[in-house]
């Protein structure tokens, strides 16, 4: 499972100490327009904690981030979303940005993959605008969710309770407002 005690900016454990996520496999799904820090920081921190982190995208290959109002750096995906199997991973991370989740929520493979993680009770972390994907997957009704403020109405309209906190954990769903929190 995805430990709740991870703090994004904690100093990495010394190499002589067992890493908290050693042996865990985490999947990040993204496409062009992902918020740069919302993919790179979780990838870096999870890797530092010992997790084997893979990135899946719509077409595989390079995807381009969005950083401070302009196109950012490319990141290379390890596999396509269609080739990813929830059974192979322990948790799922959904970076936000406006473009990334808006494109992914219209992709049936992406939504089916998110639903498969949920059906297995595996942790799903959704950052910023990524709760749009949870809404599209039908996972928010009756749940406590946070998100970037501009999609608060979407969260409420999906039947979720919007919580204005930096991070909200409700069962297997972990949501956060934005990278600045």
Where are these regions (language model features)?
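Catalytic nucleophile serine of serine hydrolases
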Residues: 128
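Extended, subdomain-level signal for the structured scaffold at the beginning of enzyme domains
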Residues: 5-120, 124, 132-136, 152-181
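Compositionally biased, low-complexity intrinsically disordered regions
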Residues: 1-2
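Short hydrophobic/aromatic-enriched beta-strand-loop microsegments
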Residues: 141-149, 163-165
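A short beta-strand/loop micro-motif in the catalytic core of glycosyltransferases
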Residues: 124-125, 145
């Amino acid at each position: 499972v995805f430990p709740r005690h991870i703090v994004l900016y904690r100093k990495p454990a010394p190499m002589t100490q067992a890493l908290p996520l050693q042996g865990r496999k985490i999947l990040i799904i993204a496409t062009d327009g992902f918020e740069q820090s919302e993919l790179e920081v979780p990838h870096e921190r999870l890797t530092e904690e010992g997790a084997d982190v893979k990135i899946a995208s719509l077409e595989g290959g390079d995807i381009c981030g969005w950083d401070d109002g302009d196109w950012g750096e490319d990141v290379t995906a390890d596999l396509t979303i269609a080739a990813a199997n929830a059974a192979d991973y322990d948790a799922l991370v959904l970076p936000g940005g406006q473009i990334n989740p808006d494109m992914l929520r219209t992709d049936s493979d992406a939504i089916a993959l998110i639903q498969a993680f949920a059906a297995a009770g595996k942790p799903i972390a959704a950052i910023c605008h990524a709760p749009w994907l949870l809404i599209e997957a039908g996972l928010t009704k009756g749940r406590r969710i946070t998100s970037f403020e501009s999609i608060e109405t979407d969260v409420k309209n999906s039947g979720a309770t919007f919580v204005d906190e930096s991070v909200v954990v409700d069962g297997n769903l972990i949501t956060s407002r934005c990278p600045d929190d």
